[in-house]
Every structure is written in C-alpha cells, then in structure tokens.
Curated annotation (Swiss-Prot):
The modification O-(pantetheine 4'-phosphoryl)serine is found at residue 35. Gene3D superfamilies: ACP-like. The gene is acpP. Residues 1-75 form the Carrier domain. It comes from Phytoplasma australiense. Keywords: Cytoplasm, Fatty acid biosynthesis, Fatty acid metabolism, Lipid biosynthesis, Lipid metabolism, Phosphopantetheine, Phosphoprotein. GO terms for biological process: lipid A biosynthetic process. Transmembrane segments: none annotated. Disulfide bonds: none annotated. This is Acyl carrier protein. One of its GO terms (molecular function) is acyl binding. 4'-phosphopantetheine is transferred from CoA to a specific serine of apo-ACP by AcpS. This modification is essential for activity because fatty acids are bound in thioester linkage to the sulfhydryl of the prosthetic group. One of its GO terms (cellular component) is membrane.
Length: 76
C-alpha cells in the first residue's frame, strides 16, 4: 500500500513511468532527482501519510525502499 501510493505520487508529480519505479530505484542515480525534486516529493509524502520527515532524514533516503520503510515504521 505504501509503495503504491509513493509510485502514484511520483508518476503524477514527476511524470515518471510507474514501471521504472521499484523498491531498489535510486532517486538520484536512476531517476535523476535533484534536491528540489526530492524536497517537493517529501513534502507531499508528509501530507499523504501524516508523517514528519526531517532534512537529515531526507538526505539519508537513497532508494524508494528507504522511504517505504521509514513511512511504514512511522505509521505504526
């Protein structure tokens, strides 16, 4: 469920192909996201999942899986 919501957001916000987004997808290397893209994406994720993502935490996210695990942990 978390992964699907993240994929939908990335497809809509960043005009990405959902097939290109997996747990192992790297934000910078595979998708070419810059820091502004990442910040905008995380702000939307905070709204959708009602979680808080600090700047330090954001910088530690390298893959989609990192985000999924963080959100799942903070939803519990």
């Amino acid at each position: 469920m978390v992964l699907e919501k993240i994929k939908t957001l990335m497809v809509n916000q960043l005009s990405l192909d959902s097939q290109s987004i997996t747990l192992k997808t790297r934000f910078r290397e595979d998708l070419g996201l810059d820091s502004l893209d990442a910040l905008e994406l995380m702000m939307e994720l905070e709204k959708i999942f009602n979680v808080s993502i600090s700047d330090t935490t954001l910088q530690n996210f390298k893959t989609v899986e990192d985000v999924v695990l963080y959100i799942e942990k903070n939803l519990a």
